[in-house]
Amino acid sequence: MSQKFDVVVIGAGPGGYVAAIRAAQLGLKTACIEKYIGKEGKVALGGTCLNVGCIPSKALLDSSYKYHEAKEAFKVHGIEAKGVTIDVPAMVARKANIVKNLTGGIATLFKANGVTSFEGHGKLLANKQVEVTGLDGKTQVLEAENVIIASGSRPVEIPPAPLSDDIIVDSTGALEFQAVPKKLGVIGAGVIGLELGSVWARLGAEVTVLEALDKFLPAADEQIAKEALKVLTKQGLNIRLGARVTASEVKKKQVTVTFTDANGEQKETFDKLIVAVGRRPVTTDLLAADSGVTLDERGFIYVDDHCKTSVPGVFAIGDVVRGAMLAHKASEEGVMVAERIAGHKAQMNYDLIPSVIYTHPEIAWVGKTEQTLKAEGVEVNVGTFPFAASGRAMAANDTTGLVKVIADAKTDRVLGVHVIGPSAAELVQQGAIGMEFGTSAEDLGMMVFSHPTLSEALHEAALAVNGHAIHIANRKKR
């Protein structure tokens, strides 16, 4: 006899597990299916983000930055650190332990909220039935009033650089290096490529980033992207724009990459090569032919603004649907869908999803860029404030970057906040909160910010929009 549930969630990543917990909190009988096998040979909850994405990469970024600080920056503070070394296996083991603790935490939350967990592969059948193929190969069918598909995404592989043991790797493999490569190649100058490239560059690798596009960080504000390129290049990342990889050859524990750029065909040899050219939705063996769920032309599950698919009672969230492939976007979609299933009128504002690149300095933004607004014909006022003028940043010896606030010239409503600098991810969230409630630049300028803090840079940038900044000369006074 099949088991019946109010909600069955396929996938326990940041979208799926959050949706399952919220649905259970709302009194719905909920099940969640996960098949990912972790490093210990057991099913691990948390999806790509927790196991091989957001969390482990941040652990390595933090470890590598501490090493860099000890070697290069302590002396400014009067601290003498001699003979600083890095134990890469220990660094990677620390990362693995963090992942283990967090995946176990999700399992505990499932139990606390009454979510029934199934280990295996979930497949949507007709009439909202879900087939679960367990790790032992046995199958069972769950009956659901509602199904939430949260199957996530996987790294894109490219024919010119097929994965090869531990020489050519994707983002997952790049988290497991046991030694610092002397020469590291990275294909793709997006979020993943820049973050992973930064990790190994700080530890001493000679890093070359090959980006097919001629423009660096095209989704970011042009002023911020220009500053980021300058800073990351100074840190040692050799970022080659307009470099299209055409072939690769693994030989004698190295890989030779062939690419074309403005100077014609080029070749570079690396000890390791990371392929970080994006991700694609996971839909393999996910939908039975008679499930009724349709895919769009790019292979994503088609959904409306409330994540409804073409089948009533079937929803899809996260990386498997349109929009930014971000964990926080998936989680909030999960909450929205669970609440709508429970009869609430939940909404999600897709215009205010923050984006972050966790290099150092961090790069973060929310809302629209200046170039987008100008292309749309919107007249704007812009205020900027450099961290070089921030007392708190000076005290921390971390003065690279700036905060940029963009406001509508007619209404003064804030339309975008863009940051490159220390704690950019935290600062941009303050802007997002204000923008969610329709804040104006004047509103932000009238708020009292603690002193001395990095957040004062946001305050000053907001004041600068209308020519009222205190701690820099205003470009124009109003």
Curated annotation (Swiss-Prot):
Signal peptide: none annotated. One of its GO terms (cellular component) is cytoplasm. One of its GO terms (biological process) is 2-oxoglutarate metabolic process. Its cofactor is FAD. It is found in: Cytoplasm. Its EC number is 1.8.1.4. Binds 1 FAD per subunit. GO terms for molecular function: dihydrolipoyl dehydrogenase (NADH) activity; flavin adenine dinucleotide binding. Disulfide bonds join 49-54. Keywords: Cytoplasm, Disulfide bond, FAD, Flavoprotein, NAD, Oxidoreductase, Redox-active center. It catalyses: N(6)-[(R)-dihydrolipoyl]-L-lysyl-[protein] + NAD(+) = N(6)-[(R)-lipoyl]-L-lysyl-[protein] + NADH + H(+). It is an enzyme of class 1 (oxidoreductase). It comes from the Bacteria. NAD(+) binds at residues 188-192, 211, 245, 276-279. The active site is at 451 (proton acceptor). InterPro entries: Class-I_Pyr_Nuc-Dis_Oxidored (IPR050151), FAD/NAD-bd_sf (IPR036188), FAD/NAD-binding_dom (IPR023753), FAD/NAD-linked_Rdtase_dimer_sf (IPR016156), Lipoamide_DH (IPR006258), Pyr_nuc-diS_OxRdtase (IPR001100), Pyr_nucl-diS_OxRdtase_dimer (IPR004099), Pyr_OxRdtase_I_AS (IPR012999). The keyword NAD applies. FAD binds at residues 34-49, 58, 122, 319, 327. The branched-chain alpha-keto dehydrogenase complex catalyzes the overall conversion of alpha-keto acids to acyl-CoA and CO(2). It contains multiple copies of 3 enzymatic components: branched-chain alpha-keto acid decarboxylase (E1), lipoamide acyltransferase (E2) and lipoamide dehydrogenase (E3). Belongs to the class-I pyridine nucleotide-disulfide oxidoreductase family. The active site is a redox-active disulfide bond. Homodimer. This is Dihydrolipoyl dehydrogenase. It comes from Pseudomonas fluorescens. The gene is lpd.
